[in-house]
């Protein structure tokens, strides 16, 4: 395992090192009020970042499309096709966490720091070719959410970028045994990966329509924007399929008290439980993505629905009980009662139930589900 990427790829480790160093200098020069420090989290922060080999296919004059491993066959006999040697490149977003000082007003500070870091995000997204995101976090909120997988992964694997070191920034957050994560984290994983699957199902329909238009000649074959959009749509669908497979496996392990902080060990734990090997293949795809998905959408859909039943089967009475606190949280933040059938259940459980119905019925997420998920995610 490298500093940032999975496996041996020193050139990408250096790329991320250099980018973080330069971003650190840029952030320091901004002198952003109430900002305590910035770290790189996510896969590249804990040495689990993905690597893809990129071929740049040049179609016609001034038109380029990035592909994995194999060239794009062109249907235009007048087009030129030139390929460069494959080069390793980043395959995932760079997820930075900007930690505020203690005792600051939450919404105002998050908005101000987010706006101040926006030019840095935009500049480096363009330079690196992957999304460079800054999530602004308040210390007390991280402490409040310390039982969440996202927080636990962050405090276990990060790379210092600017300001105070992570050791100081995260000193108040307890490290939790992976096997003792609460069942609600399994529900949250199923909710989020289910939403990603719904987005992929919706996007896949758009891509199919676009390909049909290209075949019919409704869209000119010389329109590189249409081709590039198809490539991006497929990439989006493939990534969410993979995240779904990984998320379902992780949720199962959390619900059974078998979770582990290293993804390779989670794959081994699932293999010991007699899984079909799909999770292990998804791990390989995560580290070395290709243009072919780990499975098709229907397989991902069936896997999610099966996983939902496994996770729900392990729910405890406290997690699936109706309480005044749950009702109050929903009413205050959503300003509506919502479905009577699930009223006063934990908001994550309520949204998970809605996600399940949408996936079961192959329905696109409606405005109500989107709003619920955005508020309680």
Task: Please name every model-derived segment.
Residues 2-3:
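Low-complexity, highly charged intrinsically disordered N-terminal segments
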Residues 24-56, 65, 80-94, 99-107:
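Active-site nucleotide-donor binding segment shared across nucleotidyl transfer reactions
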Residues 51-88, 207-231:
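Intrinsic disorder/low-complexity segments
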Residues 119, 281-286:
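Extended charged low-complexity segments that act as oligomerization/scaffolding linkers
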Residues 271-283:
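Short, well-ordered alpha-helical segments
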Residues 286-377:
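Terminal (often C-terminal) interaction modules
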